[in-house]
UniProtKB/Swiss-Prot annotation:
Gene name per UniProt: Yipf2
Keyword Nucleotide-binding applies: no
Keywords attached to this entry: Acetylation, Endosome, Golgi apparatus, Membrane, Transmembrane, Transmembrane helix
Family: Belongs to the YIP1 family.
Cytoplasmic side: 2-120, 181-198, 248-252
GO MF annotations in UniProt: small GTPase binding
Cell location: Golgi apparatus, cis-Golgi network membrane; Golgi apparatus, trans-Golgi network membrane; Late endosome membrane
Protein name: Protein YIPF2
Transmembrane residue ranges: 121-141, 160-180, 199-219, 227-247, 253-273
Domain of life: Eukaryota
Record-listed N-acetylalanine modification sites: A2
GO biological process: vesicle-mediated transport
């Protein structure tokens, strides 16, 4: 205890000497330092707590702003998101539909859970318009080669082409999606595309027929059938490669039957367009060539009439 008191007294003397040398210096005790440090620590800690709470509140506010209510399916806002694509995305999906190969899933590699209706809508509209126009141009070119052919514009082909293409691009995917959804209940491991993804796959698969229809203007029958077969093979292969990951876990009979029906319906569409819009001309469009009518035996020809002589 004596040693401690001597040390304290010695420190007090040193402090007194320092004060004597610098009387204007400010003095603070150790307790004041500790109190101020504790106060600073409390203030800093409370500031950090308030900052963290503020950041959490900001995050919650941003999440609430991001989670906007989804529009109803009967409103235009609901379908607006399906047309929100740029040119590069549409071109990439068209390229994917033109170059199918095994192991390349169109939905997984090109749609990426973002199906669009912009591409299928305009592809169907373009195909219907090109079918009607080229069907009429075929008659015009035939009339130029053979003047005996009578041509009249067939505007009803525009309506028929539009109804056929749009019904196929929407009703067939609807039936296919419904069947796969029904089979999903019996086979729990089966994956399933959404209805809009199925429509998108069918819409882009029809793009290959647009240049094919233009090439059908070449007036060579075997070449037209060759172009049609190539287009059908590319388009049907894209559908089969895309649907195979969905149906492969089903029974072999169901998978084979479903893919066969898909290819058959695709072939019927191509065959129907070829035979209807590029069919041979009916007989009422061919004007028969004028034929020479033999003169009646009772009619005297001018050369056989002899002038009368007068006496």
């Amino acid at each position: 205890m004596a040693a401690a008191d001597d040390l304290a007294f010695h420190e007090f003397e040193e402090a007194a000497n320092l004060l004597a040398e610098t009387p204007d210096a400010a003095t603070t005790s150790q307790s004041d330092k500790l109190t101020s440090q504790e106060h600073v620590a409390v203030v800093v800690g409370s500031g950090i707590g308030y900052g963290a709470e503020g950041e959490e509140e900001d995050d919650k506010t941003s999440l609430l702003q991001d989670e906007k209510p989804q529009p109803r399916f009967w409103t235009f806002d609901y379908y607006q998101s399906f047309f929100d694509v740029d040119t590069s995305q549409v071109l990439d999906r068209i390229k994917g539909s033109l170059l199918p190969h095994p192991g390349h899933n169109f939905v997984r590699h090109h749609l990426r859970n973002r199906p669009d209706l912009y591409g299928p809508f305009w592809i169907c509209a373009t195909l219907a318009f090109v079918l009607a126009v080229t069907g009429n141009l075929t008659l015009v070119l035939a009339q130029r080669r053979d003047p005996s052919i009578h041509y009249s514009p067939q505007f009803h082909k525009v309506t028929i082409a539009g109804i056929t293409i749009y019904c196929y691009a929407w009703l067939v995917p609807l039936a296919l999606w419904g069947f796969l959804r029904w089979r999903q209940g019996t086979r729990e491991r089966m994956g399933l595309y959404t209805f809009l993804e199925t429509v998108c796959v069918y819409g882009y698969s029809l793009f290959v027929f647009i240049p094919t229809v233009v090439l059908w203007l070449i007036p060579v029958q075997w070449l037209q059938w060759l172009f049609g077969a190539l287009a059908l093979a590319l388009s049907a292969a894209g559908l089969v490669f895309t649907l195979w990951p969905v149906v492969r876990e089903d029974t072999r009979l169901v998978a084979a039957a479903l893919l066969s029906i898909v290819v058959l319906l695709h072939a019927l569409l191509a065959l129907g367009c070829k035979l209807y819009f590029f069919q041979p001309l009916p007989l009422d469009h061919v004007v028969p060539a004028p034929q020479a009518i033999p003169p009646s035996p009772n009619v005297l020809l001018p050369s056989s009439v002899q002038p009368m002589t007068t006496f």
